[in-house]
């Protein structure tokens, strides 16, 4: 199986997001990398489902609450930018203050 660098990066985000979901289900708080992966995966999968950029920017801010991440993670994650392929082309989705307070 030959994967491009972009495909490898997508797979890594997906795996990290899956780990984050399992840790949340066990009641554990997420670290920076897990939180970013989970929100990024939400945006990528939402685009794949055909959602609009504006809808994804809003819904991504509701994926995690401050009580679900380790102390300080909410301030470390000021913005998440994801380049995503939509049916009408590739777009940059920016999610400001992605962890719900």
Swiss-Prot record:
Annotated compartments: Cytoplasm
- The lineage's top-level taxon is Bacteria
E.C. designation(s):
3.5.1.5
The reaction(s) catalysed by this protein are: urea + 2 H2O + H(+) = hydrogencarbonate + 2 NH4(+)
Matching InterPro entries, A to Z? Urease_gamma, Urease_gamma/gamma-beta_su, Urease_gamma_sf, Urease_subunit
Which Gene Ontology BP annotations are present?
A: urea catabolic process
Arranged from A to Z, the UniProt key words for this protein are: Cytoplasm, Hydrolase
One annotated GO molecular function is: nickel cation binding
Question: What interactions and quaternary structure are annotated?
Answer: Heterotrimer of UreA (gamma), UreB (beta) and UreC (alpha) subunits. Three heterotrimers associate to form the active enzyme.
Q: In which pathway does it act?
A: Nitrogen metabolism; urea degradation; CO(2) and NH(3) from urea (urease route): step 1/1
Pfam families listed in its UniProt record: Urease_gamma (PF00547)
Query: What's the chief localization of this chain?
Result: cytoplasm
Under HAMAP family, the record lists: Urease_gamma
Name by which UniProt lists this protein: Urease subunit gamma
Q: Might you report a single GO cellular component term?
A: cytoplasm
**Family statement drawn from the similarity comment of this UniProt entry:** Belongs to the urease gamma subunit family.
